[in-house]
């Protein structure tokens, strides 16, 4: 409970994992959306609650049967506005001024440092197992795209692994 304020949407995911996930069979598709972001049958502008009811995804499309999980399209975090970089990324700039103009260094780690706190992601990575830590650090330093919003649809068997790994990691942080 003391960490709840830091978990945001994950508070519900934790509750679901602890209280509901076990009631589903391993092949059942389970999906999570986010406030004002929903899984839709097709790309369409939602203008009313009626539009949402008509277009919200209620069962997985057949083409998903060849997948284990489905996640949102990635978003790019490179090329932050220069003023934002100066205001929020100044610690990163002091450490490495080339971040200001080198797009390869405008990565996920920089984005996280700017928006969630400098060094927090590095400290969180330190409590990971060695192999995962190395892969994670490489990913956040080498990439400028990630899949946002904690939105995904997956079968129970994969959600169980995801939640176990995720919350074990978060409890160590």
Go through each PLM region and give its residues.
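ER/Golgi luminal nucleotide-sugar-dependent glycosyltransferases, focusing on the catalytic module
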Residues: 1-173
């Amino acid at each position: 409970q003391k960490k709840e304020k830091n978990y945001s949407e994950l508070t519900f995911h934790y509750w679901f994992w602890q209280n509901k996930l076990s009631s589903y069979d391993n092949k059942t598709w389970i999906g999570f959306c986010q406030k004002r972001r929903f899984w839709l049958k097709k790309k369409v502008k939602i203008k009313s609650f009626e539009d949402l009811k008509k277009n919200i995804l209620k069962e997985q499309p057949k083409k998903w049967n060849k997948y284990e999980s489905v996640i949102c399209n990635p978003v790019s975090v490179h090329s932050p506005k220069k003023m934002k970089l100066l205001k929020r990324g100044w610690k990163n700039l002091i450490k490495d001024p080339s971040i200001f103009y080198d797009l390869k260094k405008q990565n996920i780690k920089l984005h996280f440092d700017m928006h969630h706190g400098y060094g927090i992601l590095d400290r969180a990575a330190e409590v990971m197992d060695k192999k995962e830590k190395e892969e994670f650090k490489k990913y956040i330093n080498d990439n400028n795209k990630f899949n946002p919003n904690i939105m995904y649809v997956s079968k129970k068997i994969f959600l169980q692994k995801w939640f176990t790994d995720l919350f074990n990691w978060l409890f160590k942080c």
